[in-house]
A protein has these predicted regions:
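Subset of outer-membrane beta-barrel
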Residues: 1-260
Length: 260
């Protein structure tokens, strides 16, 4: 769960539930997610399914693997215009709600990783769907478009002492007609059970991360971030909580410690 710009009227709120599971051959894996976003009067729902094929590239300490993934998803955008506080209460543009159609999309990515490093590239939505109002039979107008976005990420874990590791990572995001954005993450892993760190998204936000590996199966996390833009001081920051649970079935081993 993520609450952004707490105290700001109409601030974004996001809930996500996801899962992933390797198959018996260990070469194939699948997963899925359900996500809900609310920003002002707009709600969006997304359902996705993922499949991945993994290649073993090494059997040494790193146990390097290369994973190729495909994603299929459907999204729907709804706008509750009647909830908007307007000056002219009789404005016909705000007297109806808009229910968009379900929009299909596909994505792809690749992920190279070992026990202590990773490098990934992805494009979760390759189709540039138009967001069109279909609540009126008299006309349709384009509200926006799902632009194609590319992500690149990389990270590495260095052991400093027996119970202390340093884990930096970077993320770069590129979207058509939008400035290139990215962030840097500096994390420390203590006793393999606790991860604390900070991050900075260029000209956007700065934040702090804390995670606790309660057991081999359960991990809890909390993130606090503050804007470094003109929004600073207008809200109580953004807060995110995370719960991750690994289900062991039969003799399947749980990798521990697992950095990412």
């Amino acid at each position: 769960h993520r609450s952004q710009w707490v105290g700001f009227d109409g601030a974004p709120v996001t809930q996500t539930l996801s899962f992933n599971k390797p198959l018996k051959t260990d070469e194939f894996a699948f997963g899925g997610a359900i996500a809900h976003d609310k920003i002002g009067p707009t709600n969006s729902f997304n359902i996705s399914m993922d499949g991945a094929y993994r290649l073993n590239l090494g059997h040494g300490r790193e146990r390097t693997k290369l994973s190729f993934g495909l994603k299929g998803s459907i999204s729907r955008y709804q706008t509750n215009l009647t909830s908007v506080d307007v000056v002219d209460k009789g404005d016909e543009s705000f007297l109806r709600n808009e229910n968009g159609s379900w929009l299909p999309n596909v994505g792809a990515g690749a992920f190279l990783y070992g026990r202590t490093y990773f490098l990934g590239v992805s494009a979760p939505k390759l189709l540039t769907n138009k967001l069109v109002n279909r609540s009126s039979s008299l006309f349709e107008y384009m509200q926006g478009r799902e632009e194609r976005t590319y992500y690149m990420t990389a990270g590495k874990v260095w052991k400093i002492r027996r119970q202390l590791s340093f884990y930096p990572a970077v993320l770069v995001k590129a979207t058509k007609n939008a400035p290139l954005s990215g962030g840097a993450f500096l994390n420390f892993i203590v006793m393999t059970e606790f991860k604390i760190g900070a991050y900075y998204n260029f000209k956007e936000v700065a934040g702090a991360i804390a995670q606790w590996q309660v057991s081999k199966k359960l991990r809890l996390g909390y993130t606090l971030e503050m804007p470094v833009t003109s929004l600073f001081g207008t809200n109580l920051g953004s807060h995110e909580i995370m719960l991750n649970y690994s289900i062991k079935k039969g003799r399947t081993a749980i990798i521990y410690p697992k950095y990412f």
